[in-house]
Amino acid sequence: NLENFDHKVFLDGAKIAFETIINSFNNGDKSTLKGLLTGDVYKSFEKAIDEKKINPEYQFYSLTIEKIEDVIIENAIIKITVRFLSEQFKNNDESTVIKKQDLWTFEKPIKSKDPNWLLSST
C-alpha cells in the first residue's frame, strides 16, 4: 500500500537486508538467502556459492550511504532501486578497507500486507 509508504522505514529495512544478504552470501548461507531474494536472483546467488565464486576473505565492514534512486510500478509490483555505498575489508585486516557501490532493486506486490521486500536485481 503506497499511501502509508515511509521511505525512512523502507531504507532502514533495505540496510538490514543489504547487510544480511552480503553476510549470508559470503558465508554460503543459502537458507537465509532464499527468504530474501526473488527466485531468479536466488538461483544466481546459489550458483555462485556452489561454484565457489564467493570470496569469503572479504567481510562486510560498514554501510555508509543508502539512497532511493528509482521507483517503478509494473504489473501491480512496486520496484524500488537503492544505491548502497559500503566498505569491506580483507582477511580480517581493517586496514585493507575497500569501498563498494551497488545498485539493488527490491520488489513486492503493491497490495501485499507483508512488510518484507525481496531483492530482485543487483
Please identify what each model-predicted range represents.
Residues 1-60:
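Core segments of small alpha/beta cavity-forming domains
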Residues 4-11, 66-70, 97:
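Phosphate-binding glycine-rich loops and adjacent basic patches that engage nucleotide phosphates
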Residues 30, 52, 66, 70, ...:
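Functionally constrained cores in energy, signaling, and assembly domains
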Residues 48-55, 68-70, 105-108:
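Intrinsically disordered, low-complexity boundary segments flanking structured domains
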Residues 54-92:
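Surface-exposed, charged secondary-structure patches
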Residues 79-81, 92-122:
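Short beta-strand edge/turn micro-motifs at domain boundaries
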